[in-house]
Amino acid sequence: PSNRAITFALEQFLQIDSLNIPFILIAGNHSTPRTNLSSPILKIFENFKNIYVSYNQEYKKIEFDDVIFHTLPHLNDDSKALMQIESCEANISESKKNIMMMHCSVGAWYLMQEFGEWVYPSNKEYIFEKMDYVALGHWHGFGAVGKHKNVYYSGSTERTSLNDKRNSKGFIVATLEDKLNIEYKSINIRPIRIKEINCDDLQDSIANLDISDTHDAIVEVKLTNLTAMGSIDIPNKQIKDLFPYAMNVSIKREFKKSDDNQTLSDMEAISLEEYF
């Protein structure tokens, strides 16, 4: 995230901390360094009185008067996962509520070999039955997990890419009394607007562009019917300047086929001399 985003977030965490509201954060794959040369970003919260963090790629128990949070952050090394899960199981208390917090994929065995993925082992899913609630992060959509009645992904509270534009965003309110009650709270977030500029008739297409609905929006601009030479003459800044009040503008270039049926993907595979 940008410095501006980090600064804004810290101001909100300071407000929560000042109100003496306990707040627990666990590290995900994007906030976990892949080498020992980097420092975990969540370390900045160590000196906050009411913010508890778990980021060292190991199990951490966070205990209160009537509840224990069993936290398992993202793990880069799957070989260490079993020991950490067993530590978690050993700390389950029968006299308190037990909430498990993890950043991983549950039930997605097909991702086992993907770089940067931590997949929770299926032979340890029986531990979920010993928990009052299992709160998961990593996947960006809300949903229950498989046959488990107490295991949920809350999803992200904001879209993290344009591929996420159709998904509802929100958060979970979990109530642990006699039985678990899960309520999903949908929130209104900034819209994603898709605009198209036909580069066969660039000036007229720009003149007819409707930007009235792009204030504070995430905008995706499709430049269609591009040629290789024509694309060079349309810098990204020129297009982004058309949307001065948008929160973010991304540009997708769609090249039309040339007479010899070569496309953009072909350009990446041959030399410029051969292409032209």
Regions found by a protein language model. Name each.
Residues 1-60, 127:
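Core catalytic region of metal-dependent phosphoesterases/phosphodiesterases
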Residues 6, 76-82, 92-131, 162:
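Active-site-proximal segments of metal-dependent phosphoesterases and phosphodiesterases across multiple
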Residues 66-76, 98-105, 151-155:
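Active-site-proximal beta-strand elements of phosphoester/diester hydrolases
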Residues 177-276:
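Accessory, non-catalytic peripheral segments of nucleic-acid enzymes
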Residues 112-180:
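Conserved beta-sheet core of the metallophosphoesterase superfamily
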Residues 25-37, 60-62, 76-79, 105-110, ...:
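Active-site environment of divalent metal-dependent phosphoester hydrolases
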Residues 9, 28, 69, 103, ...:
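Divalent metal-coordination and catalytic microenvironments
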Residues 18-23, 96, 130-132, 149:
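A short helix->loop->beta-strand "cap" motif at the edges of active sites that frequently abuts
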